[in-house]
Design a protein with these regions (language model features):
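Hydrophobic transmembrane alpha-helices that form the core helical bundles
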Residues: 48-56, 64, 73-152, 156-160, ...
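Select transmembrane alpha-helical segments in multipass membrane proteins
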Residues: 25-37, 62, 101-114, 147-150, ...
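Helix-loop-helix junctions that connect adjacent transmembrane segments
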Residues: 23, 62, 138-143, 172-302
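C-terminal membrane-solvent junction of multi-pass transporters and transport-like membrane proteins
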Residues: 169, 340-350, 388-409
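Membrane-interface "cap" regions at the ends of multi-pass membrane proteins
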Residues: 1-62, 66, 73-77, 205-206, ...
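Juxtamembrane interface elements at the cytosolic ends of transmembrane helices
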Residues: 4-16, 49-50, 79, 225-245, ...
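TM-loop-TM module centered on a large, flexible mid-protein loop between adjacent transmembrane helices
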Residues: 94-95, 101, 132-137, 252-317, ...
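Juxtamembrane helix-boundary/capping and inter-helix hinge elements in multi-pass membrane proteins
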Residues: 56-59, 85-89, 98-104, 240-248, ...
Length: 409
């Protein structure tokens, strides 16, 4: 990239934080947005949690999504502000380092690391059975584990080759996910309209309690939004690879949450309106695929499942990218074990190869001990909430002392 005024400004801002430019800056607004959008991956989150929502709170449970969107958008606004003030790779680790104490920053960095290492195999475990079904591979524990391990290996390899290739693939995945979600939403709305679907189903509580007793189940359904609308800060983790990062990243963070929230809400409404028989859906092991295939037919259903596979793969790949940058950011501060190895950037690929290999090894180990992982996978919901809480509390306490940069987001 030509080292013009914007590049020079990015370098000067980074040097103000006592870091030198080592990673190649090539990400622009869409690519930065794509990183955050893929990490959120509404396709992955909704497909994983729709069954829980529909069986816990009935069709009316989908409206908790709107509440979760508002809450996460407020968090995103704070993170966007921090990304504009401190445009350095490492997101919450770097922010809290300057808002609180080094110990709190170190703890936050390690919590973030644990979350990312756990969530990669968890995401790919969601891809495996869908891919196996499309390829007519028998769904067994051994086959699923092999698919997950191969997926993790491929995601790591793409990251080692370089951020440019990974970004190209991710940009394409975001495009296909967006087109797929919009297209499927329209098809489901049309199908529901053609069979004169009753809009009152959107307020049905199904087998759940009604009245004041419904408050508990409804609150539980918010877990879908809480599980899904996380990871938007991933674009901040690639700040040092982003052009004009202090303006680009904040816009990407807010846009990713806002558009994910809007697309997700319309998709949930369309899917719920298209329910052919509520009793059958409530008793189904896979309610959403059942609704899609019974409404649109086998061909369109499988076509969308291909898009689902692409979206989930991109989600895991982006998380791998984000994890590598976190390890790199912590290592150059000597806040990670064997920092002298993990802070190195490959001159050929402009990527933290050693850090990515560490992620690969740890994720393969987690996958091999999958029975233990299932007990830990709940942490992938708790850990980001803890990271957000620590960041927001640290920011609220230090906000009056934060120096805002003129011209920032």
């Amino acid at each position: 990239m030509k080292k013009g005024g914007t590049y020079s400004e990015d370098v000067k801002i980074l040097e103000a934080f006592n870091y030198k430019q080592e990673l190649k800056r090539s990400l622009k607004l869409f690519s930065s947005f794509a990183v955050a959008f893929s990490f959120i991956s509404i396709t992955t989150g909704i497909f994983t949690n729709y069954k829980f929502v529909i069986q816990t709170g009935g069709p009316a449970g989908i409206w908790s999504w709107a509440i979760a969107v508002v809450g996460q958008l407020l968090v995103a606004l704070i993170f966007a502000e921090l990304a504009g003030i401190i445009p350095v790779s490492g997101y919450s680790y770097q922010w809290i380092k300057r808002l609180s104490t080094p110990f709190v920053s170190w703890i936050t960095g390690w919590i973030s690391f644990c979350f990312l290492i756990l969530v990669i195999p968890a995401v790919d475990w969601g891809l495996a059975p869908v891919l196996a079904g499309l390829l007519n591979i028998p769904i067994s524990d051994q086959n699923i584990m092999i698919i997950v391990m191969c997926t993790i290996l491929l995601q790591a390899a793409l990251n080692i080759i370089g951020v440019k290739l990974a970004t190209f693939i991710n940009n394409g995945a975001v495009f296909t996910e967006t087109i797929g979600m919009i297209g499927l939403t329209i098809f489901l709305f049309v199908a529901a309209f053609n069979r004169n679907a009753d809009p009152s189903i959107l307020l049905s509580t199904g087998n759940a309690a009604t009245g004041t007793s419904y408050i508990g189940p409804f609150i539980l359904t918010m877990l879908m939004g809480s599980f899904t609308l996380v990871g938007f800060e991933a674009s901040a983790n690639l700040s040092e690879e982003t052009v004009n990062a202090h303006k680009t990243v904040p816009k990407a963070i807010i846009a990713s949450v806002a558009l994910s929230g809007i697309f997700g809400m319309f998709f949930l409404i369309a899917s719920t309106l298209a329910i052919p028989n509520l009793g059958d859906v409530l008793n189904s092991n896979n309610p959403l695929p059942y609704i899609i295939e019974s409404t649109l037919g086998d061909v369109l259903g499988k076509l969308f499942l291909v898009l689902v596979c692409i979206s989930i793969f991109a989600c895991g790949m982006v998380i791998t990218t984000s994890a590598g940058r976190l390890i790199y950011a912590m290592s150059r501060d000597n806040a990670f074990f064997f920092s002298q190895y993990f802070k190195k950037i490959s001159p050929k690929t402009n990527s933290p190869v050693a850090a990515t290999l560490l992620i690969l090894i740890l994720c393969l180990i987690s996958t091999y001990f999958a029975e233990s992982l299932t007990l830990l996978v709940g942490a992938t919901a708790v850990l980001p909430a803890l990271i957000y809480l620590i960041t927001i509390v640290s920011y609220s306490r230090a906000r009056k002392n934060v120096e805002f940069r003129t011209g920032s987001f």
